[in-house]
UniProtKB/Swiss-Prot annotation:
The gene is rbcL. InterPro entries: RuBisCO (IPR033966), RuBisCo_large_chain_AS (IPR020878), RuBisCO_lsu_C (IPR000685), RuBisCO_lsu_C_sf (IPR036376), RuBisCO_lsu_fd_N (IPR017443), RuBisCO_lsu_N_sf (IPR036422), RuBisCO_lsuI (IPR020888). The lineage of its organism: Eukaryota, Sar, Stramenopiles, Ochrophyta, Bacillariophyta. The basic functional RuBisCO is composed of a large chain homodimer in a 'head-to-tail' conformation. In form I RuBisCO this homodimer is arranged in a barrel-like tetramer with the small subunits forming a tetrameric 'cap' on each end of the 'barrel'. Substrate binds at residues 127, 177, 181, 298, 330, 382. This is Ribulose bisphosphate carboxylase large chain.
Length: 490
């Protein structure tokens, strides 16, 4: 039965005379809420302060990340406040964690500016992470609706077009980071690029913190890198590249360096995650307009992505970066020196490479989501990997990935070119064995494939001898909540 005008007036009067009332009673909790296809959905892992009800904590997160403040305000009456309030609609206990809960929250899509990652994140992670009602808070996953995704450009090039440009199919791409990452002169830097590409790699790259320092200014680096690229391409007949890091103090300088990279013939440029979301989107637009690949180094991500109870899960960063429009992003190796539970890494790679995401709790994927024709993003595996792990890398990561062996190329005892050749032969022999039906991931079969290939490749034999006992066996900090897993270093 509908309420009379006087009854509705009394209810509103009671609400707005009450000063401070619980968030759950302010409209930010609705267990019967019917999720709309146009809603932005967020899953938070919440750790309420002692004595705070989980439902109230979830409602507080919904309120503080949408329209609420600490008290009732009359100006709510001047808005469609019932529509614009985020709705916490489900709270589940986290398995094997007595004080943690998964809170599902729905946001009206009109709360966010079209095509603006900065505006989306200003609400979702902007202020709420410092809220006293929760002891810790982590953004675990998001579902971005089709209608909102369509306002973002997605990767400027994508996996398919990148392979067409390189004319390379059915195999991972090979790369390496120049080492040492700081201190080389431009001439020696270019020599490293040439040796690595001549030996069989597809890409060399700058590291995250090489920009324009006194020992080597950016223009000097770009020129020497391009000399190495052009010589290696002419010698091998293959398309080659080196990720030229254009990260700088101002966007004016970033654009200046990017334009110069284009003028001297580079096919790819690189930026760092620490540039910020607006800068990343701006560079993705520039890369699309100028027909360049855009590589993103995830510098800084572990400051908020690694801890299990507070921060942002990296799968969310993967979604945001694919929306922003980068072509490459570092996404973990499983077997290297950096954080990488195998199931979590699978979830990151699915997020970057699939056109539709299904719910997969062991992989940390909580929502179905169509990518609305946004191009796929190429994951990059980098950090403590070597050719002796090739069977594991292909098994865990598949073909659509750039395998970057920095120390695993430049640390080769016979030199950089030999290190690159060892990686190329290891990769091609493993891909061939896989395509012929070999049980290559078997811990006896895979290494034997490499040993057989090394009989006719001295650089591979030297690499296997040097690194055969190297692994990084540490338990991952961020593991799946719905499956018992451990770091897969074997």
């Amino acid at each position: 039965m509908s309420q009379s005008v006087s009854e509705r007036t009394r209810i509103k009067s009671d609400r707005y005379e009450s000063g401070v009332i619980p968030y759950a009673k302010m409209g930010y909790w609705d267990a019967s809420y019917a999720v709309k296809t146009t809603d932005v959905l967020a899953l938070f892992r919440i750790t309420p302060q002692p004595g705070v009800d989980p439902v109230e904590a979830a409602a507080a997160v919904a309120g503080e990340s949408s329209t609420a403040t600490w008290t009732v305000v009359w100006t709510d009456l001047l808005t469609a406040c019932d529509r614009y309030r985020a709705k916490a609609y489900r709270v589940d206990p986290v398995p094997n964690a007595a004080d943690q809960y998964f809170a599902f929250i729905a946001y009206e899509c009109d709360l966010f500016e079209e095509g603006s990652l900065a505006n989306l994140t200003a609400s979702i992670i902007g202020n709420v992470f410092g809220f006293k009602a929760v002891a810790a808070l982590r953004l675990e996953d998001m579902r971005i609706p089709h209608s909102y995704l369509k306002t973002f450009q997605g990767p400027a090039t994508g996996i398919v077009v990148e392979r067409e440009r390189l004319n390379k199919y059915g195999t991972p791409l090979l790369g390496a980071t120049v080492k040492p990452k700081l201190g080389l002169s431009g001439k020696n830097y270019g020599r490293v690029v040439y040796e690595g590409l001549k030996g069989g790699l597809d890409f060399l790259k700058d590291d995250e913190n090489i920009n324009s320092q006194p020992f080597m200014r950016w223009r000097e680096r770009f020129l020497n890198c391009m000399e190495g690229i052009n010589r290696a391409s002419a010698a091998t007949g293959e398309v080659k590249g080196s990720y030229l890091n254009v990260t700088a103090a101002t966007m004016e300088e970033v654009y200046k360096r990017s334009e110069y990279a284009k003028e001297v013939g580079s096919i790819i440029i690189m930026i760092d995650l620490v540039m910020g979301y607006t800068a990343i989107q701006s560079m993705a637009l520039w890369a699309r307009e100028n027909d360049m690949l855009l590589h993103l180094h995830r510098a800084g991500n572990s400051t908020y992505a690694r801890q299990k109870n507070h921060g942002i899960n990296f799968r969310v960063i993967c979604k945001w970066m694919r929306m922003s429009g980068v072509d490459h992003i570092h996404a973990g190796t499983v077997v290297g020196k950096l954080e990488g539970d195998p199931l979590m890494i699978k979830g990151f790679y699915h997020t970057l490479r699939l056109t539709t995401l299904d719910v997969n709790l062991p992989y940390g994927l909580f929502f179905e989501m169509s990518w609305a024709s946004l191009r796929r993003c190429m994951p990059v595996a980098s950090g403590g990997i070597h050719c002796g792990q090739m069977h594991q890398l292909i098994h865990y990561l598949g073909d659509d990935v750039v395998l970057q062996f920095g120390g695993g190329t430049i640390g080769h005892p016979d030199g950089i070119q030999a290190g690159a050749t060892a990686n190329r032969v290891a990769l091609e022999s493993m891909v061939l064995a896989r395509n012929e039906g070999a049980d290559y991931f078997n811990q006896e079969v895979g290494p034997q494939i490499l040993r057989n290939a090394a009989k006719t490749c001295g650089p591979l034999q030297s690499a296997l001898d040097l690194w055969k006992d190297i692994s990084f066996n540490y338990t991952s900090t961020d593991t799946a909540d719905f499956a018992a897993t451990s770091t897969a270093n074997v």
